Amino acid sequence: MRSALLLACLLATASAFSVRSWLRRARAGDSEENAVLKSRHRYYLYRYAYPPLHRYKGSDSSEEEGDGSEEEEEGGAPSHAGTQAAGEGLTLGDVGPGGDAASAHQDCKGGQKGTRGDSGDEDSDEEEEEEEEEEEEEEVEEQDVSVNGTSTNTTAETPHGNNTVAAEEEEDDDEEEEEEEEEEEEAEATTAAATTAQDEVTTLGDEQRSEVTTAGEQWEYEVTVGARGDEGPTESSYGDQEEPARGDSYRAYEDEYGYYKGHGYDMYGQDYYYNQ
């Protein structure tokens, strides 16, 4: 029993792998990328359940082309049916002596020819309508071209009509470009002159202001250079008063920053506090 079960298991696994490989077999049109992403068993399972759809030979092409085949079929079907009914309705009893049957067949043929003639008339009418529409469209196009000023008649009269028109257009374009360049040059010249005048005015104004401010500052420095608030001049007053003044804020703290330059504000010596 155990050996039989083992054999059955082995057969089942082998059959499963074989079926799996058969389902995943590669076709001629498939690539490796599609083989990874596709699930092939769907096609084999549903191939017979859902047969492929067939396109019927319907009236799609005839409707798009507009050749009137439907009208011919609609118009010709009743006539053929009537002739067939008439032909079937004839019997030996109805046919008289002397070739009445032949006359009946001729009547049927005449009816068929009449229906074909009617269909031919319809085709000719449709062709005439199409030709009229094309002529109207051509007339409209010619009118549009004449309105735009480039009619075919004017160009056809001269041997090189198109070339002359193109040359005239190029000349007009060149003239317009030259005019635009001249206008740009004039505008640049005017802007340059205006900017130079403004620069000269601003420089003169700056010089006048500098002269006025320097005179006032010198007067202020001369007044305040020898004083240190309410104390007045001391023994250790500045000996270089003849030099150009540099401002009261600098002269008041020159000795402090010169003597204690290498120390921080928290490392002032006793001399600083004693002199204060």
Swiss-Prot record:
Motif window: Integrin-binding motif: 246-248
Motif Cell attachment site per record, residues: 116-118, 228-230
Gene Ontology CC entries for this record: extracellular region
Keyword annotations of the record: Biomineralization, Cell adhesion, Glycoprotein, Phosphoprotein, Secreted, Sialic acid, Signal, Sulfation
Chief localisation class: secreted
Compositionally biased region (Polar residues): 145-165
Composition-biased stretches (Acidic residues): 61-75, 120-144, 167-188
Secreted is among the record's keywords: yes
UniProt key word Signal: yes
One annotated GO biological process: bone mineralization
A Pfam family assignment: BSP_II
Disulfide bridges in this chain: none
Residues bearing glycans: 148, 153, 162
Assembly description: Monomer. Interacts with integrins; the interaction promotes cell adhesion.
Annotated function: Binds tightly to hydroxyapatite. Appears to form an integral part of the mineralized matrix. Probably important to cell-matrix interaction. Promotes adhesion and migration of various cells via the alpha-V/beta-3 integrin receptor (ITGAV:ITGB3).
Additional free-text comment from the UniProt record: It is possible that the segments of clustered carboxyl groups mediate the strong binding to hydroxyapatite.
Name under which the protein is recorded: Integrin-binding sialoprotein
